């Protein structure tokens, strides 16, 4: 195996600052935990891409994504199919833009 390390952040539209976690940029919060069509298309493309090579990959998941059964099922399948080279990391609970807020080490 070639030792190339790639990390991928796994953010849906509801996680971007326009919709969540930023004190001035969040204007239209998305209240649903349903996956967006764009995210589902990205999941399918990611899986196709993983099938095209043997390099190790780390996927950083926002923990609240696990509230979607569809996402959980997809992640479980990825881990079954690519267990030898896929690592899952946590990219936070809900993708708050910490650097945009006043310091709060207790909450952080």
Predicted regions and their residues:
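Catalytic alpha-helical scaffold of carbohydrate-active enzymes acting on polysaccharides/glycoconjugates
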Residues: 1-108
């Amino acid at each position: 195996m070639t030792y190339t390390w790639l990390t991928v952040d796994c953010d849906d539209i509801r996680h971007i600052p326009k919709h969540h976690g930023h004190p001035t940029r969040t204007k239209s919060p998305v209240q649903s935990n349903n996956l967006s069509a764009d995210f589902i298309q990205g999941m399918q493309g990611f899986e196709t891409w993983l099938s095209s090579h043997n390099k190790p990959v780390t996927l950083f998941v926002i923990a609240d994504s696990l509230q979607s059964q569809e996402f959980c099922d997809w992640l479980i399948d990825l881990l079954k199919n690519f267990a030898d080279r896929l690592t899952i990391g946590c990219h936070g609970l809900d993708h708050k833009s910490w650097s945009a807020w006043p310091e709060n080490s207790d909450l952080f």
